[in-house]
Amino acid sequence: MRILGIDPGLRVTGFGVIDVSGHQLAYVASGVIKTPTADLPTRLGTIYDGVSTLIREHTPDQAAIEKVFVNVNPQSTLLLGQARGAAICGLVSGGLPVAEYTALQLKQAVVGYGRATKEQMQEMVAQLLSLSGRPGTDAADALGMAICHAHGGNTLNTLGGIAPALAKKGLRVRRGRLVG
């Protein structure tokens, strides 16, 4: 299975592509989609086109993207949400199922600690994919998103989806884990 991970951003959107066979992960590609200094619609179009090109070039089977977090600056949050929307439109237009994960879920799945630093993410991604060096921060987050989906993402989604039924039994999902 091939997974495309996306770390959305208005100026720079990171991408990472990995192959998954059982528990084995293999690096395929990573990098960034940079938008020009232009009006918002042009930048969003660049993100959409970039994601569409990635799908044509790498033919992924699934995609994973980071959920938007609420920033202290509401304007920044809105712009990030629009960039994320452009990326999701590109993914869906390419026929991919799209999974969404929070930054906390991403870091927990890749590093084992939800408050991991950018450097810790870069190092762990490099180790998990046997890279000779650390990828850039945006590419590392995108590769991490793909790794999160490959390893624990499906479990996190399943637990989240059955949370109402678990609550009736006195159980709940906390930080991606089942607790009583």
From Swiss-Prot:
PROSITE patterns xref list: RUVC
Single GO molecular function: magnesium ion binding
Binding residues for Mg(2+) 2, per the UniProt record? E66
Tell me the GO BP annotations in alphabetical order.
Answer: DNA recombination; DNA repair
Q: What is its EC number?
A: 3.1.21.10
**Annotated binding of Mg(2+) 1, by residue:** D7, D138
Q: Which of UniProt's keywords are assigned here?
A: Cytoplasm, DNA damage, DNA recombination, DNA repair, DNA-binding, Endonuclease, Hydrolase, Magnesium, Metal-binding, Nuclease
Entry annotation: catalytic residues: D7, E66, D138
**Subcellular location(s) per record:** Cytoplasm
Tell me the cofactors it needs. Mg(2+)
Query: How many and how are cofactors bound here?
Result: Binds 2 Mg(2+) ion per subunit.
Q: Which reaction does it catalyse?
A: Endonucleolytic cleavage at a junction such as a reciprocal single-stranded crossover between two homologous DNA duplexes (Holliday junction)
User: Can you name a GO cellular component term?
Assistant: cytoplasm
Keyword Glycosyltransferase annotated: no
For the protein in the UniProt heading, the enzyme class is: hydrolase
What the record says about family reads: Belongs to the RuvC family.
Q: What does this protein do?
A: The RuvA-RuvB-RuvC complex processes Holliday junction (HJ) DNA during genetic recombination and DNA repair. Endonuclease that resolves HJ intermediates. Cleaves cruciform DNA by making single-stranded nicks across the HJ at symmetrical positions within the homologous arms, yielding a 5'-phosphate and a 3'-hydroxyl group; requires a central core of homology in the junction. The consensus cleavage sequence is 5'-(A/T)TT(C/G)-3'. Cleavage occurs on the 3'-side of the TT dinucleotide at the point of strand exchange.
Question: What PANTHER family does the database record attribute to this sequence?
Answer: CROSSOVER JUNCTION ENDODEOXYRIBONUCLEASE RUVC
Q: Cite the NCBIfam families for this sequence.
A: ruvC (TIGR00228)
Q: How does it assemble?
A: Homodimer which binds Holliday junction (HJ) DNA. The HJ becomes 2-fold symmetrical on binding to RuvC with unstacked arms; it has a different conformation from HJ DNA in complex with RuvA. In the full resolvosome a probable DNA-RuvA(4)-RuvB(12)-RuvC(2) complex forms which resolves the HJ.
Question: What's the protein called, per UniProt?
Answer: Crossover junction endodeoxyribonuclease RuvC
Q: What is the lineage of its organism?
A: Bacteria, Pseudomonadati, Pseudomonadota, Betaproteobacteria, Burkholderiales
